[in-house]
């Protein structure tokens, strides 16, 4: 699966990023998301596979395309059955966020990207649109930090594992009222805080790359993005833990349902028997082979955003494989029209 689909999923996120980037700075976050969804789905349907969306734009009645349960790929099309022999058929589960950080795109801010993760069937946790408490840290701190420990304890552990003072650590936290106490604790411990308005996938995986000046992600964000982050962190060897948050009283507002009971039922309907379980990266992305791909829409810590020029654009993407244990940055020049995409070496 790695060799067959790796390059194609790069093109999937590239097309989504280019489509969304055309709406950068126009204040139209919904449009920026919609065009990314359409572009991602169109390119995905050209891949020789039978794919199933396990994390997408919402449940079937909430989204017109890339909804949870939707099948994508050539081998799901009625007129392509002859092309898809059973013994050669690749069946995969897919988690997507065609425009992570819609507000960032709408207002021309840094950090938005098109992302997806894939694995063989059953290899990704099907997480509904609830929240997730998250902890991401560098590989050297893997299995030493713990989401059930305080921020102060975890910062001390990270500083010891990295052989640096707590004051030299930078922790990314989403700028939300629910994180007021967490932010205060991190600062009192001596570490520095980088607040972000949206898009915590990039922050999570940046912990696994030296030189990003990001050493931890803490706090509560969306669960679907947590699974996508876990897919990347599993392949990179970084630390990631997530615990589903299904009680609206904890977050006050956002993605989840009207009551705790409603959300518990939704979790059970999706096969999650223990809603309080703490998952690690290997449990959130448990497949034998896991691939992660992202393409910058606006500039970020890891990738440049889409840069347009007359009749073309330049993108920077990242593809991570658990099988080959590699993270590849791909710099691509796209010549619009009939000219094929050129990849810079």
UniProtKB/Swiss-Prot annotation:
Sequence positions that bind substrate: 100-102, 131, 176-178, 198-200
Required cofactor(s): Mn(2+)
Reactions performed catalytically: beta-D-fructose 1,6-bisphosphate + H2O = beta-D-fructose 6-phosphate + phosphate; D-sedoheptulose 1,7-bisphosphate + H2O = D-sedoheptulose 7-phosphate + phosphate
Residues that hold Mn(2+) 2 according to the record: 97, 100, 225
Name the record gives this protein: D-fructose 1,6-bisphosphatase class 2/sedoheptulose 1,7-bisphosphatase
CDD domains, alphabetized: FBPase_glpX
Enzyme class: hydrolase
Pfam family, one: FBPase_glpX
Pathway noted in the entry: Carbohydrate biosynthesis; Calvin cycle
GO cellular component: cytosol
GO process terms (BP): fructose 1,6-bisphosphate metabolic process; gluconeogenesis; glycerol metabolic process; reductive pentose-phosphate cycle
E.C. code: 3.1.3.11, 3.1.3.37
Transmembrane portions of the chain: none
Superkingdom in the source lineage: Bacteria
Function: Catalyzes the hydrolysis of fructose 1,6-bisphosphate (Fru 1,6-P2) and sedoheptulose 1,7-bisphosphate (Sed 1,7-P2) to fructose 6-phosphate and sedoheptulose 7-phosphate, respectively.
InterPro entries: FBPase_class-2/SBPase (IPR004464)
Keywords: Calvin cycle, Carbohydrate metabolism, Hydrolase, Manganese, Metal-binding
Family: Belongs to the FBPase class 2 family.
GO MF entries: fructose 1,6-bisphosphate 1-phosphatase activity; metal ion binding; sedoheptulose-bisphosphatase activity
Residues reported in the UniProt entry to bind Mn(2+) 1: 33, 57
Subunit relationships: Homotetramer.
PANTHER family membership: FRUCTOSE-1,6-BISPHOSPHATASE 1 CLASS 2-RELATED, FRUCTOSE-1,6-BISPHOSPHATASE CLASS 2
